[in-house]
């Protein structure tokens, strides 16, 4: 009887372990796939603004992969390194890049591992953004032109986590801005998994944590709030209270108890990506029209829009309207940076 019970227990444990490993592998394959470069978009791509915003292409290593980046505004008086969100590319944040250059900053952007022009089979995991930003900071410190400039960080979502998490190891950073970021990869994994399958997700949490540690080692344990506290670097943490991707009262960096060197902006009614968009009536009206036109096109092709038709549609979008920024927020960020620099 005891042997039979032991076998049943071992079988249950085996099923649990194999299910945990399998589920973790499946989730990572789905969530952290390779992200291609954008070929058409409702927002500006570099080809749309190349003449007005010349840039220098650079390469640097992050682990086994070579990342591709671009330096804009070489005559700027301070360097902003931008870290993009998961599923996006550096080009997604071109409106912010152009705005910073117009204010007199030099900007280094790059495609993270497994993204766009950079190497990598996939984006690996939630800790990868900080690993790549480490590499970008090391590159800037060795670049003949960039090493002369004071360094500032700007990140959103995946990149928002990175912009704070790297501070403990990069005290040369003068200030950092984290938009819609999370505190730790593990907290966000649990929050998102619970949203999909409820409390049962915590049965598989150890496998996700183990997977991150196998991939990233000690880097998997980085806490953005702890890095802010230990570094003493001025940090501006911005989050929308209507963010459903990273909850402002959950895994978000802004939900943590932060040290006095951190300033926070919890913005009513703002979502995960609305922080990046213009807040004008013209933008709202125009994007409503674009979305309605695209929905009609989608229905006309039963959801299978040919690539050439899709490209033609986006070519007709007025990028001078869609390619703006939230001026008030960006001005607050500029003031924050300038205060930290002086």
Predicted regions and their residues:
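Catalytic active-site module of serine/aspartate enzymes centered on a nucleophile-bearing elbow/loop
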Residues: 280-342
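Short beta-strand/loop motif that positions the catalytic acidic residue
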Residues: 230-232, 237-239, 243
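The serine-hydrolase catalytic nucleophile loop
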Residues: 86-99, 112, 249
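Short alpha-helix in the alpha/beta-hydrolase fold that links the catalytic acid
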Residues: 233, 247-257
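Hydrolase active-site cap/lid region
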Residues: 165-217
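An N-terminal hydrophobic leader/cap segment in hydrolases
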Residues: 8-61, 68-70, 291-317
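Conserved alpha/beta-hydrolase
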Residues: 97-119
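Alpha/beta-hydrolase active-site loop
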Residues: 92, 123-144
